[in-house]
């Protein structure tokens, strides 16, 4: 009854399907806890595996879970549907992916500016130098993080397909109604 009359708001859903509720007059005043022990925040399952499914053989060390970033951004922009998020270390593009997911869920128009360099890993740098390439050469730059991981992940998640053009498999967790990854954003 309190949900129906607006005293209590549904603010989310746990991995197990339990609704997260808050008194409407306290929304935006609650501080986050320092540890979120949530299955969907697993970097190996919803970071590394996610990247592998989108980017095939391309590698990125330690990507964050899209859901951990999504929940963090949602916490501070829940009532700011036109927020501008700036990610100064864009890495694998998780922040942009999370912003797009959040906008798709709540109809927001948040924007995300990604900033990153185009460095290559130490192993790739050695291999490229052994072949006579230097930073700035086309062969070097195409293996840099921005060109090889960040941008392709962003494009693939928006289009709903992997780097080979195949539809992404599965649904995004916690979305009601279910959002199919293959539908893109």
Language model regions located:
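Class I S-adenosyl-L-methionine
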Residues: 1-84, 106-109, 119-125
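Non-catalytic alpha-helical coupling and interface elements of nucleotide-dependent molecular machines
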Residues: 4-8, 155-163
């Amino acid at each position: 009854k309190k949900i129906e009359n607006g005293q209590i708001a549904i603010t989310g859903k746990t991995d197990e399907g339990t609704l997260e509720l808050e008194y409407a007059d306290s929304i935006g005043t609650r501080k986050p806890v320092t540890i979120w022990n949530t299955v969907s925040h697993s970097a190996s399952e919803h970071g590394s595996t996610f990247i592998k499914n989108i980017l095939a053989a391309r590698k990125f060390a330690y990507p964050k879970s899209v859901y951990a970033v999504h929940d963090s951004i949602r916490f501070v922009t829940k009532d700011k549907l036109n927020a501008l998020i700036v990610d100064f270390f864009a890495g694998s593009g998780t922040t942009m992916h999370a912003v797009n997911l959040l906008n798709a869920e709540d109809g927001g128009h948040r924007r995300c500016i990604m900033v990153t360099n185009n460095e290559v890993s130490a192993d790739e740098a050695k291999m490229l130098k052994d072949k006579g390439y230097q930073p700035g050469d086309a062969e070097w730059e195409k293996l840099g993080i921005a060109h090889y991981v960040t941008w392709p992940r962003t494009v693939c998640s928006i289009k709903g397909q992997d780097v080979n053009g195949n539809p992404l498999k599965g649904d995004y967790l916690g979305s009601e109604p279910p959002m199919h990854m293959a539908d893109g954003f």
